[in-house]
């Protein structure tokens, strides 16, 4: 079978080594004669999987001991509701920074539970889309927390600054598309959440990192399935968890540790992004409209100078083994998602194709 590189924004490409191990263990896991999908989540075998996954995840991000790691359901959209329901306490407002599609989606959901103080951080710099630096973000005095999205998959916008708003500001962040791709200082956040389907594992699992002093404040109307304290008290097994996604995510964590951890991923991700943006910037045939300071290293949207060639580009790239390059309907054009599992070889194959496509059609 020819080599396929999957540039999907999520569910995204998984490491080949992880898929191979899962394939080998699919019907006989741990010598039990059954699949990991068939064993009890409360049995000692799966409990070991869960405990190792949490330990490895903590190691990868250096999660401080006063933070809890929860393995939840509901994806990022579930957390759009869970954050206000768990963190508001007796306050009625929260600060939300709008820098793109997913931040706006979080704001829309939050309006069901509080009065968001929305700061629009989107700006245009020299005709390119950008985000105001954190020092210019206007926060309110009475907010329960401040929420933002460090990486906008659709817009191709990243906010790589580390929050520094003082110890009294609880920062909540949607890291779904950038978790584990670069080192972060977890202690600067109150809540970090991430859907698994981009840099962690299969869809269906959501990881929440929450500072323990924020537990026990859930709104009385908060559904139990979204209550951080309930999940913490039950070892993330309040109900039957997505066991296969948990198991496979655990394999990804071990793969990351075996390949240099988050620091090494950071270096490789920088190389991949520089290679792809380099081809775009050195061409009049392709363009990206995000200011360099805010370009995402995970999701690279780009347009062809002649949109009439879009269909042909997608057909020929697919035939070349470069899949899922169609841009989101909101932005159009193309989008290459190059998460941790995408090897440098895959980005090189894409850029080689782009150069050749331009030679033939430019």
UniProtKB/Swiss-Prot annotation:
Swiss-Prot/TrEMBL keywords: Amino-acid biosynthesis, Aminotransferase, Cytoplasm, Pyridoxal phosphate, Pyridoxine biosynthesis, Serine biosynthesis, Transferase
Pathway: Amino-acid biosynthesis; L-serine biosynthesis; L-serine from 3-phospho-D-glycerate: step 2/3; Cofactor biosynthesis; pyridoxine 5'-phosphate biosynthesis; pyridoxine 5'-phosphate from D-erythrose 4-phosphate: step 3/5
Catalyses which reaction(s): O-phospho-L-serine + 2-oxoglutarate = 3-phosphooxypyruvate + L-glutamate; 4-(phosphooxy)-L-threonine + 2-oxoglutarate = (R)-3-hydroxy-2-oxo-4-phosphooxybutanoate + L-glutamate
Spans traversing the lipid bilayer: none
Modified residues (N6-(pyridoxal phosphate)lysine): 198
Cofactor, how bound (note): Binds 1 pyridoxal phosphate per subunit.
Entry-linked InterPro entries: Aminotrans_V_dom (IPR000192), Aminotrans_V_PyrdxlP_BS (IPR020578), Pser_aminoTfrase (IPR022278), PyrdxlP-dep_Trfase (IPR015424), PyrdxlP-dep_Trfase_major (IPR015421), PyrdxlP-dep_Trfase_small (IPR015422)
GO biological process: L-serine biosynthetic process; pyridoxine biosynthetic process
Binding positions (L-glutamate): 9, 42
Keyword Amino-acid biosynthesis appears in the UniProt entry: yes
Names of required cofactors: pyridoxal 5'-phosphate
GO cellular component: cytoplasm
Coarse class of the protein's main subcellular location: cytoplasm
Residues that hold pyridoxal 5'-phosphate according to the record: 76-77, 102, 153, 174, 197, 239-240
Job description of the protein: Catalyzes the reversible conversion of 3-phosphohydroxypyruvate to phosphoserine and of 3-hydroxy-2-oxo-4-phosphonooxybutanoate to phosphohydroxythreonine.
Assembly and interaction partners: Homodimer.
Family label: Belongs to the class-V pyridoxal-phosphate-dependent aminotransferase family. SerC subfamily.
Protein name, UniProt field: Phosphoserine aminotransferase
Source organism: Shigella boydii serotype 4 (strain Sb227)
Gene encoding the protein: serC
């Amino acid at each position: 079978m020819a080599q396929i590189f999957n540039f999907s924004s999520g569910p995204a490409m998984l490491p080949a080594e992880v898929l191979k191990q899962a394939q080998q263990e699919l019907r006989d896991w741990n010598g039990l004669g059954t699949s990991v999908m068939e064993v009890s989540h409360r049995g000692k075998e799966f409990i070991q999987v869960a405990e190792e996954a949490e330990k490895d995840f903590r190691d990868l991000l250096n999660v401080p001991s006063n933070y809890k790691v929860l393995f939840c359901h509901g994806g990022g959209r579930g957390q759009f509701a869970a954050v206000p329901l768990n963190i508001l306490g007796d306050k009625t407002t929260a600060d939300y920074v709008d820098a793109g599609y997913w931040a706006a989606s979080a704001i829309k959901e939050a309006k069901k539970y509080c009065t968001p103080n929305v700061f629009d951080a989107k700006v245009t710099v020299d005709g390119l889309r950008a985000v105001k630096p954190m020092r210019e973000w206007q926060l309110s005095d009475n907010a329960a927390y401040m929420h933002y999205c460090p990486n906008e998959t659709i817009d191709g916008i990243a906010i790589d600054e580390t929050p520094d708003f003082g110890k009294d500001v609880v920062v909540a962040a949607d890291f779904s598309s950038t978790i584990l791709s670069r080192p972060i200082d977890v202690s600067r956040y109150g809540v970090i959440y991430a859907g698994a389907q981009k840099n962690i594992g299969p869809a269906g699992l959501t990881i929440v990192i929450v500072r323990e002093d924020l537990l026990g404040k859930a709104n009385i109307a908060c559904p139990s399935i979204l209550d951080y304290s309930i999940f913490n008290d039950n070892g993330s097994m309040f109900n039957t968890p997505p066991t296969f996604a948990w198991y496979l995510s655990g394999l990804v964590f071990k793969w990351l540790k075996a390949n240099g951890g988050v620091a090494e991923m950071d270096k490789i991700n920088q190389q991949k992004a520089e290679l792809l943006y380099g081809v775009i910037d050195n061409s009049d045939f392709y363009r990206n409209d995000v200011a360099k300071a805010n370009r995402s290293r995970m999701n690279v949207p780009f347009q062809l100078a002649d949109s009439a060639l879009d269909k042909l580009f997608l057909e020929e790239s697919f035939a070349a083994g470069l899949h899922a390059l169609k841009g989101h309907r909101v932005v159009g054009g193309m989008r290459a998602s190059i998460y941790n599992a995408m090897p440098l070889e895959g980005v090189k194959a894409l850029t080689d194709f782009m150069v050749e496509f331009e030679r033939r059609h430019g």
